[in-house]
Regions:
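Short, extreme N-terminal segment that most often corresponds to the first beta-strand
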Residues: 1-16
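Exposed alpha-helical structural elements
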Residues: 3-7, 54, 58, 65, ...
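Short, hydrophobic/amphipathic alpha-helical patches that form generic packing surfaces
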Residues: 33-44, 68, 84-91
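Secondary-structure edge/capping motif, primarily at the C-terminal ends of alpha-helices
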Residues: 44-51, 66-74, 96-100
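Amphipathic alpha-helical binding modules
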Residues: 74-101
Length: 101
């Protein structure tokens, strides 16, 4: 949990490029991707490292979205921000345990 908290703190120092406010990469709306990731990660952190089944499902889908988006980014898209999201999401999804509800 400490690693994700550290990465999230690092992410908060990243700049959101204004050009992403209406951008899609690989057909994925980046504002919505960022918002969904933020909601799931902050909930995971607030809950001491656990997510309900619905949010875990969302996070798994967002991990797949990130893996499609990352190769499409250029430097003006601040790929460092998206790599941080990817690392946090992967760590949370890989951590388990998975909820039964």
């Amino acid at each position: 949990m400490a690693v994700v908290a550290h990465l999230f703190h690092e992410l908060r120092g990243e700049t959101w490029p204004a050009r992403l406010n209406t951008a899609e990469r690989a057909g994925i709306d980046l504002v919505m991707l960022d918002a969904d990731l933020a909601g799931c990660v902050t909930t995971w952190l607030s809950n001491g490292g656990s997510l309900d089944a619905r949010r875990l499902g969302i996070l798994c889908r967002k991990l797949s979205d990130l893996e499609q988006v990352l190769p499409e980014l250029d430097e003006a898209d601040n790929p460092g921000l998206w790599r941080l999201w990817h690392e946090m999401t992967r760590l949370i999804v890989d951590t388990g345990p998975y909820p039964t509800n």
